[in-house]
Amino acid sequence: MAHHNGPRKKTRYKFKKDLRKRGIPPVTSVIQSFEIGQRVHVVVEPSVQKGMPHRRFHGKTGTVIGQRGRAWLLEVRDGDSVKQVIARPQHLKAQKV
């Protein structure tokens, strides 16, 4: 059988976009910046493959702890443990205060 354990497996409904929101995201989502200590939501943008976090973190909220090139380093709780996630800004949304 063919290899079937890719990074996007089991994402048929999780990464689906609305019909009107299909296509590439606006430039404002690419150039957004965050401050260290700021809370952000991990919302995977399925049309952008670069800098995409693991599907496990889709819908989670984390804290920005640094920057790695164009991507941001986040601290996200996964059960009892705290994990570091690297994601580009297209896959992040700032939490409203």
Curated annotation (Swiss-Prot):
It comes from the Archaea. Belongs to the eukaryotic ribosomal protein eL21 family. Disulfide bonds: none annotated. One of its GO terms (molecular function) is structural constituent of ribosome. Keywords: Ribonucleoprotein, Ribosomal protein. The lineage of its organism: Archaea, Methanobacteriati, Methanobacteriota, Stenosarchaea group, Methanomicrobia. This is Large ribosomal subunit protein eL21. GO terms for cellular component: ribonucleoprotein complex; ribosome. PROSITE patterns: RIBOSOMAL_L21E. NCBIfam families: PRK04306.1. InterPro entries: Ribosomal_eL21, Ribosomal_eL21_arc, Ribosomal_eL21_CS, Ribosomal_eL21_sf, Translation_prot_SH3-like_sf. GO terms for biological process: translation. It comes from Methanoculleus marisnigri (strain ATCC 35101 / DSM 1498 / JR1).
